[in-house]
């Protein structure tokens, strides 16, 4: 007889071809109930886990298996060097930071499960949820959920982009702009909204010149942001331009193949950095239609808290933050979510 939690049953069943003695008759699964379930794997998720575990509310954290196409640890795992997270004067990689956070949450008693929560039912209490390996099985249940599923930067997936991702191409100027490979070098920003203007302005602190590649013949940004970009001597706005390819020496980016859609002229633009500023996609599919979302798909929370419109469901990190999107702010909101969830659980008892 094999006794497993029901979240593991689907995975074992999928391995039946490798283990001939595994069949439905000798697998007995048990329903699992949690006090607090954290969905996510970034700074918000692990900070929430640390606080809850230290409060003796043993949380379960589903970190996912390549959830939303990103390894456990979230977007930070795609960042080569982090120099602005307090406490690390020598810097460290995003993966190193997340490994330390995960080790700390496990140390205090968090149950970390490497499966992706693919479905939730918030219509009754306790809440129900399923993972991608057990959607046809009985669900697990939980008294509270902390959503910290993050948001992924929109990318163009240009030819050459994978080669030079984090070797000249980034989706966060604030995170990566100060990296040595960008200092005193020509840089480019793709986008025409407020975020693109803000990132271009920020990058002028480090780059010798910043090109804004704008697909249309005008900026979408607010008037004040447009004016600041247009009046900055280090920013050159290339209207009616699209990017066709990322080029380099095999190690680092050194040019973009661009096209003027008005004249059809194609040419190589020498730059050592490309920053996407075309928006983010919050990972809210599993709660769409159950939790209130804003127009961009981010989870709405009560100002000054992590409470959603569903009592017992909390949101932390980039999934509810369209503005800051930093590791430190995500960690802070994870702490808030833990405290909010702890209060909720205490009141239930």
From Swiss-Prot:
Top class in the EC scheme: oxidoreductase
GO BP annotation list: removal of superoxide radicals
Binding note for cofactor: Binds 1 FAD per subunit.
Alphabetical UniProt keywords: Disulfide bond, FAD, Flavoprotein, Mitochondrion, NADP, Oxidoreductase, Redox-active center, Transit peptide
Molecular function GO labels: thioredoxin-disulfide reductase (NADPH) activity
Subcellular location: Mitochondrion
Known cofactor(s): FAD
Transit peptide extent on chain: 1-30
Primary residence: mitochondrion
Disulfide bonds: 172-175
Source superkingdom: Eukaryota
EC number(s) per entry: 1.8.1.9
Positions with a binding annotation for FAD: 41-44, 70-71, 75, 84, 117, 175, 318, 325-327
Additional note from the record: The active site is a redox-active disulfide bond.
Subunit composition and interactions: Homodimer.
Family of this protein: Belongs to the class-II pyridine nucleotide-disulfide oxidoreductase family.
Protein name: Thioredoxin reductase, mitochondrial
Species assigned in the record: Kluyveromyces lactis (strain ATCC 8585 / CBS 2359 / DSM 70799 / NBRC 1267 / NRRL Y-1140 / WM37)
